[in-house]
Regions:
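Conserved catalytic motifs of ABC-family nucleotide-binding domains
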Residues: 174
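Short coil-to-helix segment of the ABC ATPase nucleotide-binding domain corresponding to the Q-loop/switch region
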Residues: 111-120
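ABC ATPase NBD coupling module
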Residues: 32, 83-99
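Catalytic Walker B motif of ABC-type/P-loop ATPase nucleotide-binding domains
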Residues: 178-181
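Conserved ABC transporter NBD signature motif
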Residues: 74-85
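Conserved ABC ATPase signature
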Residues: 153-157, 161
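Helix-to-loop junction immediately C-terminal to a conserved catalytic motif
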Residues: 66
Length: 238
């Protein structure tokens, strides 16, 4: 599935290193610290599930690692790029190599599934031809059990089917890191297994890594590690 250029080199044995990261939001009641001196290492090929109660800081940590949110305190290295300060080039480089899967799929209503996936391939440095993108789209959708929707629009699909399209969109560029925020929340058991199975095959084939934020205990047993955030602090295996 992935191109040879997507394979990780031995130069970066860890996909993610988080050291001493803290994050504080300003609220009406005063500053609220949601991350408190968090350390985390995500190894190449590793699949980690991150769980914890709502407001524990899980999504904040995910968006910091994905260079969506700017770092306040501590250090984060993602795929060899140091995040922090005003180095927007490093942030852009990370975002190009990450596949994001969010609970809110945000599909364009006017685009077919294939158009959505083909549009996503334009975000990388060397986008594939239409023919190559079409073949990859067919393969991903078949593995997710929705190949019949290649030329469908979102209004023609169920919520779970649209979520699986979002998974395909995240994987079509063979990302070196997958970050997911409740990616299986709208899926039944069978669909969840299809999604996690596809992610695991991608990790095995490329050496990529995955960090998935979820309350879905159905997938805990499919992860290499299950970590818990509580009151901004990262605890051991849940």
């Amino acid at each position: 599935m992935p191109a040879a250029s997507a394979l990780l080199s031995d130069a970066h044995p860890h996909s993610v290193r988080v050291r001493g990261v803290s994050y504080t939001y300003e609220s009406e009641g005063g500053p609220k610290r949601v991350l408190d001196n968090v350390d985390l290492t995500l190894g190449r090929g590793e699949f980690i599930v991150l769980t914890g109660h709502s407001g524990a800081g899980k999504t904040t940590l995910l968006t910091l690692i994905g260079a969506i949110r700017s770092l306040q305190d501590g250090a984060i290295n993602v795929l060899g790029q140091e995040l922090g300060g005003r180095d927007t080039a490093a942030q852009e480089e990370v975002r190009r190599k990450v596949g994001f899967i969010f609970q809110d799929h945000n599909l364009f209503a006017a685009l077919t599934v294939f158009r959505t996936l083909w549009l996503a391939t334009g975000l990388i440095e060397n986008p594939p031809s239409r023919e190559v993108a079409l073949a990859e789209a067919r393969s991903l959708l078949a593995q997710l059990g929705i190949e019949q929707h290649l030329h469908s629009r979102p209004r023609q699909m169920s919520t779970g089917q649209k979520q699986r399209v979002a998974v395909a969109r995240a994987l079509i560029n063979a990302p070196q890191l997958i970050l997911g925020d409740e990616p299986t929340a709208s899926l039944d058991q069978q669909s969840s297994q299809l999604v996690i199975g596809l992610i695991r095959r991608h990790l095995a084939a490329t050496g990529a890594s995955a960090l998935i934020v979820t309350h879905d205990d159905r997938i805990f047993g499919m992860a290499d590690r299950v970590l818990r955030l509580r009151d901004g602090r990262l605890l051991g295996d849940a």
